[in-house]
Each structure stands twice: as structure tokens, then as C-alpha cells.
């Protein structure tokens, strides 16, 4: 359902990535979110849905991460409204925020590799 099939969906995904990053930096002022970083965006073929994958720099526990994702999901209608005002598309996609743990897992693998090299 969320495959980048055409050049247009890739362009829209990149544009959503840029715009939502700016919106999260300047318009969403909730301390519980912390510092969100968008690691990727997947848009459906019909451009009605978008999965936004986020990571958090200063969140460590699963409860904190779940709370931050839930807050972003609750704010998704407001973010969608701001996105629709800044993008030139007929219908703004419905936004679904999901936690992306790949960066943290990659950092753990790198630290394991560096410790084995020291031995």
C-alpha cells in the first residue's frame, strides 16, 4: 500500500518531509515531544495517506517515546491543516506518525563493532 511507485509520489513525499519538519520546529510547542527528527515519509499511491517515521533525540524509555508519538498523532490534524496551506496539492494526505528505531539500533551496532575492534 505504501510503495513509492511514481516520481510524483516521491516528490510529494520529499515535500511533506521538508514541510512537516519545518512545522514541527516552529509551530508545535510541546515539551513532552522533545526534539523530533523525521527519518522518512512514505506516501500511498493514491496520495491519501502518509506514514511519517520519527525519531527522538532525547527520549530513551518506551513510555516517553509512546507518549511523544501519541501527542504527534493527536496534533496530526493541525499539522495536516498547516501542510495543506503550504503545499499546492488538491487534498492533503492523512498523516500517521510512527516511531523509527533504526537509527538507535544502528548506533548500538556501531558501538558493538567498535568495542570488538578494541579487543
From Swiss-Prot:
Gene Ontology cellular component annotations, sorted alphabetically: cytosol
A biological process term (GO) from this entry: maturation of SSU-rRNA
InterPro entries in the cross-refs: KH_dom-like_a/b, RbfA, RbfA_dom_sf, Ribosome-bd_factorA_CS
UniProt-listed Gene3D superfamilies: 3.30.300.20
Gene Ontology MF annotations: ribosomal small subunit binding
A Pfam family annotated for this UniProt entry: RBFA
Coiled coil ranges: none
The entry's keywords: Cytoplasm, Ribosome biogenesis
Alphabetized PROSITE patterns for the sequence: RBFA
Locations listed in the record: Cytoplasm
Quaternary data: Monomer. Binds 30S ribosomal subunits, but not 50S ribosomal subunits or 70S ribosomes.
Family from the record: Belongs to the RbfA family.
HAMAP family: RbfA
Role: One of several proteins that assist in the late maturation steps of the functional core of the 30S ribosomal subunit. Associates with free 30S ribosomal subunits (but not with 30S subunits that are part of 70S ribosomes or polysomes). Required for efficient processing of 16S rRNA. May interact with the 5'-terminal helix region of 16S rRNA.
Descriptive protein name: Ribosome-binding factor A
UniProt organism field: Blochmanniella pennsylvanica (strain BPEN)
Amino acid at each position: 500500500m505504501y510503495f513509492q511507485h511514481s516520481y510524483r509520489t516521491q516528490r510529494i513525499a520529499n515535500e511533506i518531509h521538508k514541510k512537516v519538519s519545518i512545522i514541527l520546529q516552529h509551530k508545535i510547542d510541546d515539551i513532552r515531544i522533545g526534539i523530533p527528527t523525521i527519518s522518512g515519509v512514505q506516501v500511498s499511491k493514491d496520495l491519501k495517506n502518509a506514514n511519517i517515521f520519527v525519531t527522538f533525540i532525547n527520549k530513551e524509555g518506551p513510555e516517553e517515546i509512546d507518549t511523544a508519538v501519541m501527542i504527534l498523532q493527536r496534533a496530526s490534524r493541525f499539522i495536516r491543516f498547516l501542510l495543506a496551506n503550504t503545499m499546492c496539492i488538491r487534498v492533503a494526505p492523512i498523516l500517521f506518525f510512527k516511531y523509527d528505531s533504526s537509527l538507535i539500533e544502528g548506533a548500538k551496532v556501531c558501538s558493538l563493532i567498535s568495542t570488538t575492534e578494541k579487543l
